């Protein structure tokens, strides 16, 4: 396969560290630079626990793109920074794979239009774990037969957004096969605000944040005399790398924005 030159934004994070290791062990990936506001002017090999890669680190993406030629930006930063990075990348015609979440429908619409206008491939993935993507697809299928459903998502206590992008995407897919309806007793009352979780078109999402967790989600469907549970667990961040690899390879052949890995796997 032809070499793909990659810039990683957010190499110091846990996902970023795994992505750097992915670059090292994948023959056709070439890490040409990284973006980290705390370590501009250093090299990847200067960071604790990193492999001996000489890719330079830039304090900001704008300067990096002025000095480095790349094929793909892999952004694994925070939601706010990720939004800025993908906008800059798309406007400059650089393909990007975005692993941050928190995009609104309006923001996705704007990015989709810009990507189409620039004919630049972009993938925004709420979850890179292939198993999690299958969980979402299975949940979408089940919703045709089970109209009553609730989602419980569980993540580490350092996660910034709630509910997770995976939970939101799961509900979006379920809604495609489910008529809008309110679940539970029509006169139910929350004795404590938020007790029933977030409500999206009658589907409740419950967010759990605890140390020791990585990324987990349970989709519970209830029916007369039966229950169906679809669950996925990521026990470490290596579970996300197969999806990162697939996304980087796939975005090279796209000329538009794709939201969600379920749209690029067969």
Curated annotation (Swiss-Prot):
It catalyses: (S)-2,3,4,5-tetrahydrodipicolinate + NAD(+) + H2O = (2S,4S)-4-hydroxy-2,3,4,5-tetrahydrodipicolinate + NADH + H(+); (S)-2,3,4,5-tetrahydrodipicolinate + NADP(+) + H2O = (2S,4S)-4-hydroxy-2,3,4,5-tetrahydrodipicolinate + NADPH + H(+). Pathway: Amino-acid biosynthesis; L-lysine biosynthesis via DAP pathway; (S)-tetrahydrodipicolinate from L-aspartate: step 4/4. Keywords: Amino-acid biosynthesis, Cytoplasm, Diaminopimelate biosynthesis, Lysine biosynthesis, NAD, NADP, Oxidoreductase. GO terms for biological process: diaminopimelate biosynthetic process; lysine biosynthetic process via diaminopimelate. NADP(+) binds at residue 38. GO terms for molecular function: 4-hydroxy-tetrahydrodipicolinate reductase; NAD binding; NADP binding; oxidoreductase activity, acting on CH or CH2 groups, NAD or NADP as acceptor. Gene3D superfamilies: Dihydrodipicolinate Reductase, domain 2 (3.30.360.10), NAD(P)-binding Rossmann-like Domain (3.40.50.720). The active site is at residues 155, 159. Disulfide bonds: none annotated. (S)-2,3,4,5-tetrahydrodipicolinate binds at residues 156, 165-166. Its EC number is 1.17.1.8. PROSITE patterns: DAPB (PS01298). NAD(+) binds at residues 10-15, 99-101, 125-128. Belongs to the DapB family. This is 4-hydroxy-tetrahydrodipicolinate reductase. It comes from Bacillus cereus (strain ZK / E33L). The gene is dapB.
